[in-house]
Amino acid sequence: MGMGILLCGLNGAGKSTLGKALAEKLGFHFIDSEDLFFPKTDAQPDYARPRKKEEAQRLLLEEIKFHENFVLASVTGDFGQDFSPCFQYAVQVAVPKEIRMKRLRDRSFSQFGGRMLPGGDRYEQEEAFFRFAESRAEDTVENWLRTLSCPVIELDGRKPVEENVLFLAEQIKGK
């Protein structure tokens, strides 16, 4: 059996960026839950038409069967009890709300430019997402991680990605 590492954090915590770098360092496959839930259209995720949870679960199962060593980035990783045994480690990426929200706005501007500003065709959609992200309870991830039986590593998502990757690689290899 391979190794599954779950990176959890609220929107803007940096779990996708960290997950890609960690997967590369370990030679693992990277899976982003956004890719499971939101089909890509014109190289951009279609947030307006998310897949159903069952479809995302099926896609995740396919990924895990094909790539037994993987890093999954997800807010919680709650894909159902059948998936919990797939994770040998879980990582909580914690970042203060103000920083997360700034990252989300910066990322949105990077993706959509002026389209996400007032008057732009993405303005309402992006603002709705920012309100949603800001309203999420800070303990959402922590509470969900308590349901797992694998070790949970806490991480400061404000630190440089390279530093966190090295820390995680040491934690995982040292056990």
Locations of the language-model features?
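The conserved Walker
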Residues: 11
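Walker A/P-loop
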Residues: 16
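Conserved substrate/cofactor phosphate-moiety recognition/catalytic segment
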Residues: 20, 24-62
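Loop/turn-to-beta-strand initiation segments
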Residues: 66-70
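Conserved AAA+ ATPase "sensor/coupling" helix adjacent to the nucleotide-binding pocket
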Residues: 106-114
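Small-molecule kinase domains that catalyze NTP-dependent phosphoryl transfer to phosphate-bearing small molecules
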Residues: 113-164
